[in-house]
């Protein structure tokens, strides 16, 4: 029979051990904020320099631009059904192909689990096996994300999809660096091929959660380590993130607060690819501002042109 003092001692030991583990693990969590530099094992991915294209004919550039084919995967759950309708009619039309997977209602996810990592694995495997030969880049985003596909293609223009690329907005979690799904995740065809092989192995990409549940984007990063691939943070030439995890209004508010003299420069990159946390109405506003509104007499001397798919009925 254990005495009351003995019971209290063991309880204290147990609580102390748990507290030490949690403090140790939480103490290792570091999130890289915009504008804050840290050393990484990999380089930061940046777009090509437009001067590199000046001596290349427009015909060749157009053909090269057509060779970049992006498959968009909209993955997630939304209580607001209008998201799906707006997504179909706005930025996803600029993808070479886009499919929307509602993790709550889609038949593809008729599996014995509500686990987001299992659902993400299912989506990636399904897309690659069905479309892997026809597209060289695969972009996964949440229903609340707005993406500028032309800027994504510009970032990828000089990248070889036969190499394993895993890029977006990187976050550090303990010893793990991963691309957060809130900013969108980009995988090259070669990496999708490797991931597909890994997913056939139930052990290498199994659920890695131990004390608490790990999110699907962290699980993906752990899985991709088996392919020898690490996350890459995408930036412009000013070092600003191009995959944003917040809505543009919030980024502007932060810039006004932090540096009111340079709001435009401090807010966002002019080559931004994603913004997250948008309502369906805000997505419509973004579409108007990006593709409809024109400043009379202002001419953008862009070297490259990325045209939306034929029949997209979208500028």
Swiss-Prot record:
Belongs to the glycosyltransferase 31 family. Beta3-Gal-T subfamily. It comes from Homo sapiens. Residues 30-315 are lumenal. GO terms for molecular function: glycoprotein-N-acetylgalactosamine 3-beta-galactosyltransferase activity. The gene is C1GALT1C1L. It is a single-pass type II membrane protein. The chain crosses the membrane at residues 9-29. Keywords: Glycoprotein, Membrane, Signal-anchor, Transmembrane, Transmembrane helix. GO terms for cellular component: membrane. It is found in: Membrane. This is C1GALT1-specific chaperone 1-like protein. It comes from the Eukaryota.
């Amino acid at each position: 029979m254990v005495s009351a003092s003995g019971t209290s001692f063991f309880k204290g030991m147990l609580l102390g051990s748990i507290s030490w583990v949690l403090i140790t693990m939480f103490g290792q969590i570091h999130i890289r904020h915009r504008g804050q530099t840290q050393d990484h094992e990999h380089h930061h991915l940046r777009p090509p320099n437009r001067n590199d294209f000046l001596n290349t004919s427009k015909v060749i550039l157009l053909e090269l631009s057509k060779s970049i084919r992006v498959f968009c995967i909209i993955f997630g759950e939304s209580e607001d059904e209008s998201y799906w309708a707006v997504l179909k009619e706005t930025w996803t039309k600029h993808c070479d192909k886009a499919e929307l997977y509602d993790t709550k209602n889609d038949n593809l996810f008729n599996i014995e689990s509500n686990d987001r990592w299992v659902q993400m694995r299912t989506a990636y495997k399904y897309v690659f096996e069905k479309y892997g030969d026809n597209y060289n880049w695969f972009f996964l985003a949440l229903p609340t994300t707005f993406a500028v596909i032309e800027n994504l293609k510009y970032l990828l223009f000089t990248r070889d999809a036969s190499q394993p690329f895993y890029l977006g907005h990187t976050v550090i979690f303990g010893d793990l660096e991963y691309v957060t799904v809130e900013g969108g995740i980009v995988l090259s065809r070669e990496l999708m091929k490797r991931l597909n092989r890994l997913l056939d192995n139930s052990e290498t990409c199994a659920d890695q959660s131990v004390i608490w549940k790990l999110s699907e984007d962290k699980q993906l990063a752990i899985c991709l380590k088996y392919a020898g691939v690490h996350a890459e943070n995408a930036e412009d030439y000013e070092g600003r993130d191009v995959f944003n995890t917040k809505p543009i209004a919030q980024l502007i508010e932060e810039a006004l607060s932090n540096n009111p003299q340079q709001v435009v420069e401090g807010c966002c990159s002019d080559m931004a690819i994603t913004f997250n946390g948008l309502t369906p109405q805000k997505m419509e506003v973004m579409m108007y501002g990006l593709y409809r509104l024109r400043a009379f007499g202002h001419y953008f001397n862009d070297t490259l042109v990325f045209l939306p798919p034929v029949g997209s009925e979208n500028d």
